[in-house]
Design a protein with these regions (language model features):
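Conserved short histidine dyad/triad with adjacent acidic residue
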Residues: 50-58, 68-85, 234-242, 253-268, ...
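Short, low-complexity cationic-aromatic patches
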Residues: 16, 59-64, 79-86, 127-131, ...
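Short amphipathic alpha-helical linker/capping segments at the junctions of internal repeats
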Residues: 112-114, 156-160, 281, 290-299, ...
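Ligand-binding loop in jelly-roll beta-barrel domains
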Residues: 119-146, 303-332
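Contiguous mid-protein beta-loop-alpha structural module that forms a pocket-lining wall or clamp
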Residues: 120, 125-180
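A structural feature that tracks compact, well-ordered secondary-structure segments
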Residues: 69-73, 99, 254-257, 264, ...
Length: 360
């Protein structure tokens, strides 16, 4: 039997989206899972890890289709064995402290620090403290697993991913005899195989955003007042991601402060969003349904093109948001509907939106 078939889509109408429902994982459930992991015998690779999985995201065990969220626990004195994979990571320490080695670079982190691990980097984690260490680790591995191209190695050679210094980018159109050259006057070019397999090199480094430094800048946004129509956040930006505004090439990570009794304006976007609330309490309204949350809760808050907004209650809220917006920017698929009274826009390929910050 042949491993293919024809599917006749002649005249087929596009079906409406079947959005997966939001989900709130309560702090108690997370704490119980942390304690369960801590009570297990130490595994051979040192990784006490539990993936938080939405029941409807399919292959890859994601909380969203493209976003994997793992609870990672290290007891005092423990470490993980070195490994590498072709997925990238954003880590967030929610309890304790520790350090990580990424291609030989050491990052010492405290509670609520954020750091990145570029793909195919050799990394290991350490808990040199006398407290339990807990991290939320966000990975794009669910996307790679859906594509059946997730590759991982345990205990690879420690120097195998050493990065050469970024070379000066040369205008390939002037390279002979294998240059890239215009085919027509309207912008169509041809590129030879020699350039295809040797694209311009972009150096990706592990980056670290210490919470105390981030908070000092973030708290200044409280002064914007209740008339401000935007969101009081900072993107933890890696310039290597360029126009896709990423923390990695797949995700952005933002830290938001939501002053008490603030209700955001409803909006929607095709990118999925996962929020971790680490101070305060409030609620989100997604497709007309209200979801309550408080500090320590994890939420799939925007399952793609769902109309949603968030609100704080009687105290300030701090939250980490992971969103797959950079991936959509790179794909040219980032529809964003900031003002529901107007039209959505394809961000990155058209002009975007503006806030009223200059007037508040």
């Amino acid at each position: 039997m042949e491993n293919y078939r024809f599917v006749d889509r002649t005249g087929v109408k596009v079906e409406p989206l079947r959005l997966i429902p939001p989900v709130v994982i309560k702090k108690k459930a997370i704490d119980d899972e942390i304690e369960r992991l801590a009570a297990l015998p130490r595994p051979l690779n040192g990784q006490r890890e539990s993936r938080v999985v939405h029941t409807r995201t399919g292959v890859g065990d994601g909380l969203a289709y493209t976003i994997g969220v793992s609870i990672c626990v290290l007891k005092p004195g423990e470490r993980t064995k070195p490994m590498r994979h072709n997925s990238s990571l954003v880590d967030f320490c929610i309890r304790g402290a520790g350090r990580t080695l990424v291609d030989g670079k050491q990052i010492d982190y405290q509670q609520y620090d954020v750091w990145t691990t570029p793909s195919w980097s050799v990394f290991e984690n350490f808990n040199d403290t006398d407290e339990l260490q807990v991290r939320l680790s966000y990975s794009n591995s669910p996307l790679l697993e859906k594509l059946n191209v997730y590759i991982a190695e345990e205990e690879p050679p420690l120097n195998s991913t050493a990065t050469k210094p970024a070379h000066e980018i040369v205008d390939s159109a002037k390279t002979n005899p294998f240059g890239t050259f215009p085919l027509s006057e309207d912008g169509a070019w041809l590129m030879p195989y020699e350039r295809l397999i040797n694209p311009d090199h972009v150096e990706l480094r592990p980056l670290h955003w210490p919470w105390q430094s981030v908070k000092a800048e973030l708290d200044k946004l409280k002064n914007l007042g209740t008339s401000y129509a935007g969101r009081r956040l900072y993107l933890m930006y890696d310039p290597a991601t360029g126009r896709t505004n990423g923390t990695t090439h797949t995700f952005f990570a933002t830290i938001t402060v939501r002053p008490k009794n603030i209700v955001d304006r409803p909006h929607r976007h095709v990118s999925a969003a996962v929020n971790y609330y680490f101070h305060g309490r409030g609620y989100s309204t997604v497709e007309g349904k209200r979801y309550e949350w408080e500090a320590g809760d994890l939420m799939l808050s925007a399952p793609g093109w769902a109309i949603h907004n968030h609100a704080s209650k009687d105290e300030d809220v701090y939250e980490l948001t992971i969103q797959d917006q950079p991936m959509h920017l790179a794909l040219g698929s980032l529809l964003w509907h900031e003002d529901l009274r107007g039209e959505p826009k394809l961000l990155g390929l058209s002009s975007g939106f503006a806030t009223n910050r200059a007037m508040v």
